[in-house]
Each structure stands twice: as structure tokens, then as C-alpha cells.
A protein has these predicted regions:
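Conserved catalytic/cofactor-binding microenvironments
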Residues: 563
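N-terminal accessory segment at the very beginning of proteins
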Residues: 1-250, 256-258, 263-271, 282-285, ...
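Aromatic- and carboxylate-enriched substrate-binding clefts and catalytic-loop regions
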Residues: 46, 118, 129, 279-560
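Basic, gly/Ser/Thr/Pro-rich low-complexity segments located predominantly at protein N termini
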Residues: 140, 154, 159-161, 172, ...
């Protein structure tokens, strides 16, 4: 039933195997499965350091004692215990796991409700549940006891007003403006990482916490103890990867809109900032500057001299950032080769398309390392080597036209099983390519992330949000919870993205407030799709109205200059 193996505490009973092991400072990793073995995948965990757990097994209840004798009052049978620094875990003969701080406080306990348990209830509710198995996959549920007065922060970015997530139900899935980063910090004094990239949900209810993955092979989570929130966050980031320092240009002002549709238009905006003496550090080339999606290159009809454009911007002290989508149009020059080599996301049934936006598109499979290399080689040739060396990784969730997660498959597995990890690997393609070129601080603007994305230079923005005061308010808590979840580089579209008119006085007031807020975000970026629309540019799509700091009246301009 209990076994110590290579510093790990192993429990097995009735076809289930539970493994608890030290993983980093003051942290314990728990894996459990009803398969014959564990997958061996570490997901968000980048590295395991030299910390080893101290394992003790007590087969005789009367043998309890020592410094922690009073900590296990509910443990009246045999049990196993593992210690790593400030964190202890006990698993009893009924398979219930309880986590303790070294001072004796209970931090977290699995939720079982059976006659044999401490509460002695005939509900037969299990703390770990495996059901509806197809092959070696299950619908997985992990339950924990709710704690009165507990506050929960983190989990990524959700478009809601709640900062404290206690009482919330959160979907574990990536969507435009929703970013699932499944780490939370508890006011009780621990951190928790759900180390599973599958689609599902979590409920932080008052009568219990419940994690669900719709399709997975094993339960996998990490508990981290600490005396302060900063200590817990430090340990978490050490295990999942710390972010590179933001380059100096990134801390300045970013000018962006949907969209500068040709080279001369973009340069004229940059020149005007220079003439006005207003500092501008970054200007962004948005989507549909390309020939076709998936060809990853400028359309020479509208961008005839990219090296010359980049040189002029550099002379003005301005960096250029280029939008890249993970989409490949079925009529693009790279589609057939990528399809033949297995570099594209596959559908399980129906029409083999994943997005419809200005064409018929399929996402490239960022979980496939060869696909990542292939895409970077195109990016390097057509952008990086032309002088455009910084990137905006849009549609990074990826944004399926139909969010039918069970219908899509990556090389790494079905989207239901592994889908939330896509933005991390999408980002990794650019991080690996840029570091190979000697970039010591590779940062990419991206619309999604997962646990561990920070290591690869994720600068997340909050997606295509609405231009309203209510939506603006939601971004404040979204940014704070993203930081707690381990994504420190974060920003928004100043003014919001959808629904504003450049000539609307009400929007001018919103813009001013948002601009002031944007100044104090990690990155200050003005972006949006302003009305009325202008119907010129590439054949696939038009362009929004002006979106520069002088576009919203004299008062807004003077205030913007101040900030």
C-alpha cells in the first residue's frame, strides 16, 4: 500500500497509484492515475532541482509520535508522510491527502465523504475521480475541502469583476480575452498549480473546490508552502521559468491601430510623433499586411521597402513590431507542404478548417517542434532578416471559429487533453528563434499564455475587449490576477478594442482615463479598431479610423502628452 522509492512516497490501492514527491523548494508534486504508469510529462514544470523529500511510513497507528504527533488527529490508521522544507503531506490508508505547514497548520486537504472518513458520511464522494474513460484517458475530477474565509487570487485573465476568486467558476480554456494560467495563491499561505493543460473547469465554491479535466490520463498538481506571498511566488516562478527583463524600448510608449495598411502611412505617423516631440518607442504593423495568411511575409504592393522602413524608424529611435498569426490559408504557398508534413492542426471530423477570417484557414501545430522550426525559418527570412525583428503573436489561443475543443487534435494530443498549452509553444517558436540570433531579452506581444509562458518572454495583452467603462474596470482585476498567476508583463488596448468612434466625446473621456491607467501598466500601448471604418488597403480587409494621441480632441492630446 505504501512505498518509498527514490525519495518519493508511493501509495497504491484498487488500481490507483498516487505519487507524492519533492519538487523545488517547499513544494510537493502529486500525481495520481488508474493507468499502469504515469506519462512522464512535466508540462509547466521546467526543471526539478536537487531538493529531496524525507519519506516516513507508519504501518502501525500506535507508532505515531515525534514533533508532528498532534498534527494528524484525523489519522487513526497507517499512513505515509513526506516532508520538503516547510511543507508536509500525509496520505492515510483511505488515500486522503492532507498538506501541512511546518508550524502544524492545515493548508489544504482532499475532499472525501465516506463512512470511513473523519466526517463519516455515506455519500461515497471521492477526492480523486476517474470516469468515462476512452482508452487510457478519463474525465478527471480532483476535490478539496473549502476553507472558511479563504481568499484566492491568480488563475490568469477572466473578463469578470471579481478579484477574489472564491465563489467563482472558471473555465480552463483559452479564448480571445480569456487566458487560463491555472496557478492560484491562497490567503491561507500556499500556492497551487494545476499542472494539466487539458480543457475543463474549476469551481472555488464555499462548500468545496473542484477541478475537472474533460480528458486526461492523470491528476497532476503542485502545492507550494511559504511564509509570505512573495516567497511562494518566487518558488513557483523558479519551477516554471522566470521572465526575461523587459528591454528598455518596451517600457516606453507603443503606438498601434487596426491598422496601418501601407508603409508610407505608418512612416507618416512615426514622423509626426517625432515632429511633435512626443516620445514614441514602438510602432506596430497589424494584420493583413501579408500576401496570404501562412505565407508570413509583407505584401510588396503596400510595403515595397521593408529594410528601408525599418532603417528610418531605427534612426528615429523607434522599434517596429509585426503581427503574426498562426493561420495558414488553404490557398497559401506553404499550405500543401505543411499539410503533407503534418504541421497543421487536424479536425477529428467535418470540414478540415479551424478559422474563417478573410479566408479559409488552418492553424499550424505549435506543439510540433518541426512545425515551430519551419514557421520560424519563414519568419526569419521574410521579417527578421529584413529588419523587422520584434513580433506580435496574435490569435494565440488559438481562436477557433467554433470552440468545439473535442474536434481538434495536435501532435501532442487532442485539444481536450492538451489544448491550453498551445500559446506556450507558439511563443517558444519565436523565443528559440530569437535567442538563436543572439537576442538576450526576447519579448513578444501575445494574446494568450499558460503556466510557464513567462520564461519565453510573454507580454500578454487582454485581447479584443469592448470600449466601455465597465470593460475598463474588468481589466484592473484581470491584470492583477495575471501577475499573481506568474505573467508579470501584461497590458491592455488603451481605450479598448471594439465599438468606439473617434469623434465621440464620451469615448474621449474613456480614452483619457484608460490612457492614464495605461501609463502605470507594465507596458503602455495604444490600440483599437475605431469607427467609422475606412475601406481601403488590402483586398481582404479595411482599416479603422485614426487612433493616435491627437485623434481625440485637444484636451485628450494635451493630457496624453503629459503622460
Amino acid at each position: 500500500m505504501f512505498l518509498e522509492k527514490e525519495g518519493k512516497l508511493i501509495y497504491s490501492y484498487d488500481g490507483e497509484t498516487v505519487c507524492i514527491e519533492a519538487w523545488g523548494k517547499d513544494a510537493l508534486r502529486v500525481r495520481a492515475t488508474k493507468n499502469r504508469s504515469f506519462t512522464g510529462r512535466d508540462w509547466a514544470l521546467e526543471a526539478k532541482d536537487a531538493h529531496a523529500g524525507e519519506v516516513e511510513i507508519f504501518e502501525d497507528p500506535s507508532a505515531k509520535g515525534g514533533a508532528f504527533a498532534n498534527m494528524y488527529e484525523g489519522t487513526d490508521t497507517s499512513y505515509g508522510k513526506i516532508t520538503n522544507g516547510k511543507l508536509h503531506a500525509v496520505i492515510d490508508s483511505g488515500s486522503v491527502i492532507t498538506f501541512y505547514h511546518e508550524d502544524g497548520r492545515v493548508l489544504l486537504k482532499e475532499h472525501f465523504r465516506r463512512l470511513r472518513d473523519e466526517e463519516s458520511m455515506p455519500l461515497n464522494i471521492m477526492g480523486r475521480e476517474y470516469s468515462n474513460g476512452v482508452g487510457d484517458n478519463f474525465r478527471i475530477v480532483a476535490r478539496f475541502v473549502a476553507r472558511k474565509g479563504e481568499k484566492i487570487f491568480g488563475m490568469g485573465q477572466y473578463q469578470q469583476h471579481e478579484l477574489d476568486l472564491k465563489g467563482c467558476m472558471l473555465e480552463l480554456a483559452q479564448r480571445n480575452s480569456q487566458v487560463s494560467v491555472p496557478f492560484y495563491l491562497s490567503s491561507i499561505g500556499y500556492g497551487f498549480l494545476w499542472n494539466n493543460p487539458g480543457v475543463g473547469q474549476v469551481m472555488f465554491a464555499n462548500n468545496g473546490t473542484e477541478w475537472v479535466t474533460e480528458s486526461g490520463k492523470e491528476i497532476d498538481y503542485l502545492v507550494i508552502a511559504g511564509d509570505t506571498p512573495a516567497e511562494i511566488e518566487e518558488n513557483y516562478m523558479t519551477l516554471t521559468g522566470k521572465p526575461p527583463m523587459m528591454p528598455e524600448y518596451g517600457m516606453g510608449f507603443w503606438q498601434c491601430k487596426l491598422r496601418y495598411w501601407n508603409q508610407e502611412q505608418l512612416l507618416s505617423v512615426a514622423r509626426k510623433y517625432k515632429e511633435l516631440g512626443v516620445p514614441l518607442d514602438v510602432i506596430v504593423v497589424d494584420f493583413f499586411h501579408w500576401t496570404k495568411q501562412g505565407e508570413f511575409k509583407f505584401d510588396p504592393k503596400y510595403w515595397p521597402d521593408v529594410p528601408g522602413m525599418c532603417r528610418e524608424l531605427k534612426e528615429m529611435g523607434i522599434q517596429v513590431v509585426v503581427s503574426v498569426w498562426p493561420t495558414v490559408d488553404i490557398y497559401s504557398e506553404n499550405f500543401e507542404e505543411m499539410k503533407e508534413k503534418g504541421y497543421l492542426v487536424r479536425t477529428e471530423h467535418g470540414v478540415p478548417l479551424t478559422m474563417l477570417c478573410g479566408g479559409n484557414e488552418v492553424f499550424f501545430d505549435a506543439t510540433n517542434p518541426d512545425a515551430r522550426t519551419y514557421v520560424w525559418e519563414k519568419i526569419k527570412k521574410n521579417y527578421y532578416d529584413q529588419g523587422a525583428k520584434l513580433f506580435w503573436l496574435d490569435v494565440a489561443e488559438p481562436e477557433y471559429s467554433v470552440y468545439d475543443f473535442k474536434n481538434y487534435r495536435y501532435q501532442l494530443g487532442s485539444v481536450q487533453e492538451v489544448g491550453n498549452i498551445y500559446p506556450k509553444y507558439y511563443l517558444k517558436a519565436f523565443y528559440d528563434g530569437m535567442t538563436a540570433e543572439g537576442d538576450a531579452m526576447p519579448i513578444s506581444l501575445i494574446r494568450s499564455a499558460w503556466a510557464g509562458s513567462a520564461k519565453y518572454g510573454a507580454l500578454v495583452w487582454s485581447g479584443d475587449i469592448v470600449s466601455s467603462f465597465e470593460c475598463f474596470q474588468r481589466q484592473v482585476q484581470a491584470g492583477l490576477n495575471m501577475a499573481v498567476a506568474g505573467i508579470p508583463w501584461w497590458t491592455t488596448d488603451i481605450g479598448g478594442f471594439h465599438g468606439a468612434r473617434t469623434d465621440d466625446p464620451d469615448f474621449h473621456r474613456l480614452y483619457i482615463r484608460w490612457f492614464e491607467y495605461g501609463c502605470f501598466c507594465p507596458v503602455m500601448r495604444l490600440h483599437g479598431n475605431r469607427n467609422p471604418q475606412e475601406g481601403y488597403g488590402a483586398e481582404q480587409i479595411g482599416s479603422g479610423s485614426d487612433n493616435e494621441i491627437w485623434s481625440f480632441g485637444d484636451e485628450a492630446y494635451e493630457i496624453s502628452k503629459k503622460y
